[in-house]
């Protein structure tokens, strides 16, 4: 009866399970980390190291996190974890944006019919409760993703000390002359009844009427019409617009002074338009019978002509502006300064005689000033009514129904309007050049971020910082009741900031203006009776103040921050508002580096929408796979562009994770009896393939560390994955199995030494990405003295300078030969010549150079490399050619009998069923 040698084999054994079970394990690990203050002790341990500050851009505290939030927070966490393991003290202070319209609207919605009589203080109380409630929810959701940080003490924009510092920044900017109050055409949300900043605008497709309207010319003070033989009573000027509702606000028509204009004769009437747009205008108006008159006339000649408004009892003025182009329309631009930025600027700056008319109230309804027949209509409803009116009156020349990109409020997602109102502004022109210099000093990743930010600052208008709402930091300005002038001084700002620091911004609504304003403050007119500004600050001013209210105030942080990292939409949001407030008050950018990521889209690259049913939630993925798979998704993605997410993608990633986990499991399973303090073999005593494996791990370390330094996590992931699958599973671990299970003590300890050293470094390298799995692996690794209990407390491995071109070339050649032999073995298996590869004897037909190369390797080692029982070398051609030059192969069934212990075939297997090697080991 054959003997059983199973008990003589060193079998793989480890409590580290093949099935990860992350959804159940991770919460227990989180409990352990919290109980043992792992994050706090890490920061304390690193306290004397150089500081690295990634300043958290505050997410809005109004709901559950989504895949975009998860992407953002995990990128930050990978950076923070890696820095803390790489010789830095990198504290992470999360923050929350807690003021603003979404919270106020939800608070109002919760009140139902009671909202009509509620006071501002009562409403603010409900808003605060809503925000703080969601902070707790979001804190727990971020922690579930494995994000480390000071979640017990996040920064909140509603905290008194934050609000006080924000008021002081406002005061500093006002003192420098950067803050002013003025009337301008600003983005206005009729649904929310408030002004908006550029950063609060999103664009979406909208359908509208594109109309061509003619205005009857009435006055020709320069005699231009007579000069060219055009009768005034038959002369018209033609405009084009897609906002029919703004026609009641028309007070001027703008021409480019340098463009050529022509009169187009239609019947017995003459219509003025840009010569270069005649054909497209006639086509759009479906007019075929027309005549373009000569000569062409420069737009400058028509300045100050007048025309009759199509339905109101007033005249409009022909004015000039360089913003008029030939890109579309008629070259004669309908100008309503009450509802257009360029319209407002050209009129106010160059034609002060032109009135600014705003016949629309804050809810988007036309007023009596628009005409009695239109009063009370919402602007969108007014479009059709006005269109029908000008059609009946003979002023409409043509209409097309088009789809175009139109600005919408990013909160309520309704279309917005431009509306000239009195607002508070930050004058960008006064420090724009300083901002350019600050932008140049920042490291932008990707590099295109520099030009994007530069272009946005270059092209932007003054920043509208006031909002007509309740839930926010009040505009800290007082008005003299006697003369109406506003009053901002060092003393008034200090009084407000001191009050807010003590009681919070609710105090603005609690006390009368005269109770807040210092008694020493007197208006220029001599009066000292005050009232408060009713508006609040733009929430972008809130978050744009975090560099001061957080980074400069919290002792564990630094300013300027080393890094700001957010989505690409923050170039017009937080990146920009922070830059503007910092440059305005300090003259420098608030950050040394800026890193940005793209949007999360579905598997087809489309935006995720609940209505489309193509979204995935972080909670779903965590429930099904675990948070480490979400983290792996982040690390495996090129986050600088849009990142795809979907169930198929996570399924594929779970397979990739399984391969990496099993690589670690193999290593753990084969070092269970290894004591690194006593069993470690010196490197120069290791087998050459063990040294190759360590060298491969060293290359991995160099590549991954470089990738981390550049925040290129997908490069790190692919290096780790390829190392696990190609270098380890497919080659090294495959080759050393026999040595681990069946060889003598020294040979086995050599392999274990390599595995141990590789596993320690590998676990550290993956720890920033797979924080849960890395800690699980780490808990099973036998520890040397000085090794930490938690892997995140460890230092990253350092890549050694171990360049050895000859060694690398040799092993590259060995692997190439092995790959060819593996293919030959697969064919032999398909031909039923062999079953397992250990049944094979391989003959290698070699060129002289290849023979000398392979013959230098002991044949038993060569057979182990190929995982066959026997290898013969023959000079000359023969067998099947592979990809390796100078090599042919043939495979036959190995001679001899199968060793009952190691399963190799050998002609010297004894009666006990053992090959000589196994017999010696059991000796």
Describe each model-derived feature in a short phrase.
Residues 2-10, 15-22, 28, 32-36, ...:
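Residue patterns forming the tRNA-binding/recognition surfaces of aminoacyl-tRNA synthetases
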Residues 44-106, 239-247, 254, 319-346, ...:
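N-terminal catalytic cores of NTP/NDP-binding nucleotidyl/phosphoryl-transfer enzymes
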Residues 46, 50-57, 68-71, 75, ...:
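Secondary-structure capping and boundary motifs in well-ordered enzyme cores
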Residues 97, 186, 190, 196-204, ...:
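Acidic, turn-prone loop/beta-hairpin segments
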Residues 189, 409, 480, 520-524, ...:
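Short cysteine-rich clusters marking metal-coordination/redox-active sites
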Residues 193, 468, 484, 524-527, ...:
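Cys/His-coordinated zinc-binding microdomains
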Residues 219, 316, 350-363, 469-471, ...:
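Alpha-helical recognition segments enriched in aromatics with Gly/Pro capping
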Residues 252, 259-332, 341-345:
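Protease-associated
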């Amino acid at each position: 009866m054959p003997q059983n040698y199973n008990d003589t084999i060193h079998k793989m054994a480890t409590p580290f399970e093949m099935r990860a079970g992350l959804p159940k394990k991770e919460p227990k690990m989180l409990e352990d980390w919290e109980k043992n203050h792992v994050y706090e002790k890490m920061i304390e341990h690193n306290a004397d190291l150089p500081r690295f500050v990634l300043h958290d851009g505050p997410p809005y505290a109004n709901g559950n996190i989504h895949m975009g939030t998860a992407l953002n927070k995990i990128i930050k966490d990978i950076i923070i974890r890696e820095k803390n393991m790489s010789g830095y003290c990198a504290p992470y202070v999360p923050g929350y944006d807690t003021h603003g319209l979404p919270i106020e609207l939800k608070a109002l919605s919760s009140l139902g019919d009671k909202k009509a009589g509620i006071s501002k203080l009562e409403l603010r109380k409900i808003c605060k409760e809503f925000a703080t409630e969601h902070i707790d929810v979001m804190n727990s959701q971020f922690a579930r993703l494995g994000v480390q940080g000071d979640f017990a003490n996040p920064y909140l924009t509603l905290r008194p000390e934050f609000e006080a510092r924000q008021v002081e920044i406002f005061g500093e900017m006002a003192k420098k002359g950067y803050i002013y109050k003025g009337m301008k055409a600003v983005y206005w949300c009729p649904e929310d009844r408030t002004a908006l900043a550029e950063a609060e605008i999103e664009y979406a497709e909208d359908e509208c009427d594109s109309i061509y309207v003619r205005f009857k010319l009435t006055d020709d003070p320069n005699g231009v019409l007579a000069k060219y033989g055009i009768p005034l009573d038959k002369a018209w000027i033609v405009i084009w617009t897609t906002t029919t509702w703004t026609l009641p606000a028309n007070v001027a028509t703008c021409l480019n002074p340098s463009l050529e204009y022509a009169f187009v004769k239609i019947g017995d009437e003459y219509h003025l338009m840009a010569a270069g747009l005649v054909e497209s205008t006639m086509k759009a108006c479906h007019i075929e019978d027309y005549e373009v008159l000569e000569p062409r006339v420069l737009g400058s000649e028509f300045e100050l002509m007048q025309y009759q408004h199509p339905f109101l009892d007033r005249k409009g003025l022909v004015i000039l502006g360089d913003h008029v182009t030939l890109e579309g329309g008629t070259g004669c631009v309908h100008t309503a300064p009450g509802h257009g930025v360029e319209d407002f600027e050209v009129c106010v700056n160059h034609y002060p005689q032109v009135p600014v008319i705003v016949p629309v109230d804050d809810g988007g309804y036309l007023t009596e000033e628009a005409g009695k027949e239109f009063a009370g209509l919402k602007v969108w409803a007014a479009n059709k009514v006005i269109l029908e009116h000008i059609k009946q009156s003979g002023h409409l020349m043509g209409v097309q129904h088009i789809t175009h990109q139109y600005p919408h409020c990013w909160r309520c997602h309704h279309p917005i309007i431009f509306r000239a109102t009195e607002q508070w502004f930050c004058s960008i022109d006064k420090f724009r050049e300083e901002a350019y210099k600050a932008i140049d000093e920042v490291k932008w990743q990707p590099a295109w971020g520099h030009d994007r930010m530069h272009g946005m600052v270059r092209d932007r208008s003054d920043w509208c910082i006031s909002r007509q709402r309740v839930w926010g930091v009040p505009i800290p300005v007082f008005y003299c009741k006697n003369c109406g002038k506003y009053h901002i001084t060092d003393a008034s700002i200090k009084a407000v900031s001191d009050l807010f620091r003590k009681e919070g911004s609710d105090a603005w609504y609690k006390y009368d203006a005269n109770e807040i304003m210092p008694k020493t403050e007197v208006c220029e007119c001599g009066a000292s009776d005050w009232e408060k500004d009713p508006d609040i600050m733009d929430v972008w001013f809130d978050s744009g103040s975090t560099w001061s209210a957080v980074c400069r105030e919290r002792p564990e942080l630094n300013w300027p921050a080393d890094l700001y990292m957010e989505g690409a939409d923050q170039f017009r949001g937080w990146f920009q508002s922070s830059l503007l407030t910092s440059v305005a008050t300090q003259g420098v950018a608030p950050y040394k580096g800026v890193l940005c990521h793209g949007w999360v889209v579905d598997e087809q690259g489309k935006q995720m929408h609940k209505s489309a049913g193509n979204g995935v939630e972080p909670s779903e993925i965590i429930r099904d796979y675990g948070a480490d798979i979400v983290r792996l998704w982040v690390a495996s993605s090129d986050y600088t562009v849009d990142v795809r997410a979907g169930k198929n993608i996570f399924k594929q990633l779970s397979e990739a994770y399984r391969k990496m986990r099993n690589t670690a499991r193999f290593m753990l399973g084969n070092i269970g009896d290894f004591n690194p303090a006593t069993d470690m073999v010196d490197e120069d005593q290791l087998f050459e393939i063990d040294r190759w494996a360590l060298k491969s791990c060293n290359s991995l370390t160099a590549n991954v560390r470089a990738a981390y330094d550049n925040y290129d996590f997908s490069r790190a992931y692919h290096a780790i994955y390829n190392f696990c699958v190609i270098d380890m599973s497919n080659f090294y671990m495959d080759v050393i199995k026999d040595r681990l299970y069946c060889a003598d003590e020294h040979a086995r300890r050599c392999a274990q030494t390599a595995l141990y050293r590789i596993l320690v470094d590998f676990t550290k390298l993956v720890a920033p990405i797979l924080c849960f799995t890395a800690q699980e692996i780490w808990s099973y690794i036998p520890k040397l003295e000085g090794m930490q209990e938690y892997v995140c407390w460890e230092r990253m491995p350092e890549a050694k300078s171990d360049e050895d071109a000859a060694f690398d070339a040799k092993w590259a050649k060995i692997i190439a030969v092995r790959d060819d032999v593996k293919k030959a073995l697969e064919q032999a298996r398909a031909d039923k010549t062999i079953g397992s590869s250990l049944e094979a004897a391989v003959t290698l037909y070699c060129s002289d150079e290849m023979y000398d190369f392979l013959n230098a390797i002991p044949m038993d080692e060569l057979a182990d490399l190929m995982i066959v029982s026997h290898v013969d070398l023959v000079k000359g051609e023969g067998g099947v050619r592979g990809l390796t030059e100078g090599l042919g192969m043939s495979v036959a069934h190995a001679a001899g009998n199968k060793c009952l212990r190691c399963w190799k075939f050998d002609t010297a297997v004894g009666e006990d069923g053992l090959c000589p090697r196994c017999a010696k080991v059991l000796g």
